[in-house]
Regions:
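Short beta-strand elements in bilobed, periplasmic/extracellular small-molecule ligand-binding domains
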Residues: 34, 56-70, 189-192
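Glycine-rich phosphate/diphosphate-binding loop of Rossmann-like nucleotide-binding domains
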Residues: 39-54, 101, 138-230, 246-258
Length: 291
């Protein structure tokens, strides 16, 4: 059985460090604030946003909430974005996705002030990441990819020269994690697999590290991985469990793979807590840039 990479423990340590940094900021007259824009009442989104504000309270970051009804128009959402852009109490913020049908998510993201882009997903910030493959970056980084890399670092997993197979090309991680993995400081070699990739499983069998972000429960099987590989499970599927009569969250990696792996992230309890921690880290870093 491989080493279980505990995202909850690493996230807790990260938040403890951030709480100290927030105290130093307050001592110098800077109060960080995280804003959220929530449109509608999707249970998953409501729960996720509530978790973010609970994290804020834990480390001393102020919460700024903007809630709109399910039938909100594009202009109403855009107005909420502009309000947070102009609000000096808001250090950074996120627009909780998905937005209701009929609202262009990309157009809304484009309206976010890049300096307040807590998710690190604004085109300007992604462009900075593309341009600067070396040295420090003074713009927010995508939370989930950053969380993956910080989680592996916490377990002293060196990715230099490693073959990394990324499954899925979604913007949250699939298309963005390669930008971080191929930076000089990480130095991994990345293969991005998607629905058009021929013989995906052959790519998986060659990989030292698999980052699974497809949203297909149990897609990665033991026969698809080599002995001693590292498995990072970012996929989220809700699967009905007949025993409990409830839906449960399942990852992309079949748990039988853990026997062959050198290390693995459980799902839930692996990358998810780190994504939330990296959101806080982005906000604290934004505040520190004001010094």
């Amino acid at each position: 059985m491989g080493t279980r990479i505990d995202g909850k423990k690493v996230a807790a340590r990260t938040k403890a460090d951030l709480a100290k940094r927030v105290e130093l900021l307050k001592a110098r007259g800077i109060q960080p604030g995280l804003g959220t824009i929530l449109v509608g009442s999707d249970l998953g989104s409501v729960k996720y946003v509530a978790g973010k504000h609970a994290d804020c309270a834990e480390i001393g970051v102020n919460s700024i909430k903007r809630e709109l009804p399910e039938n909100a128009t594009f202009d109403q959402v855009a107005d909420a974005v502009r309000q947070l852009n102009a609000d000096p109490a808001c250090t950074g913020y996120i627009v909780q996705l998905p937005l209701p049908r009929g609202i262009d998510e990309n157009a809304i993201i484009d309206l976010i002030d890049p300096k307040k882009d807590a998710d690190g997903m604004h085109p300007y910030n992604l462009g900075e990441l593309v341009l600067h493959a070396r040295g420090d970056i003074a713009t927010p980084l995508p939370c989930t990819p950053r969380g993956v890399i910080e989680l592996l670092r916490a377990y002293d997993i060196d990715l230099d020269g490693k073959e990394v197979c990324v499954l899925g090309r979604g913007i949250t991680i699939g298309r963005t994690i390669g930008l971080l993995l191929t930076r000089k400081a990480v130095n991994a070699t990345v293969t991005l697999c998607h629905t058009g990739t021929k013989d995906v499983r052959e790519h998986m069998r060659r990989a030292d590290v698999i980052v699974a972000a497809m949203g297909v429960a149990g897609f990665v099987k033991p026969e698809d991985i080599k002995e001693g590989s590292i498995l990072v499970d970012v996929g989220v599927s809700r699967v009905f469990d007949e025993e409990s009569g409830r839906y449960k969250v399942k990852g992309d990696v079949d748990k039988a793979c853990y026997e062959k792996a050198l290390a693995y992230t459980p799902n839930p309890g692996g990358v998810g807590p780190m994504t939330r921690a990296m959101l806080l880290q982005n906000v604290v870093e934004m505040a520190e840039r004001q010094l």
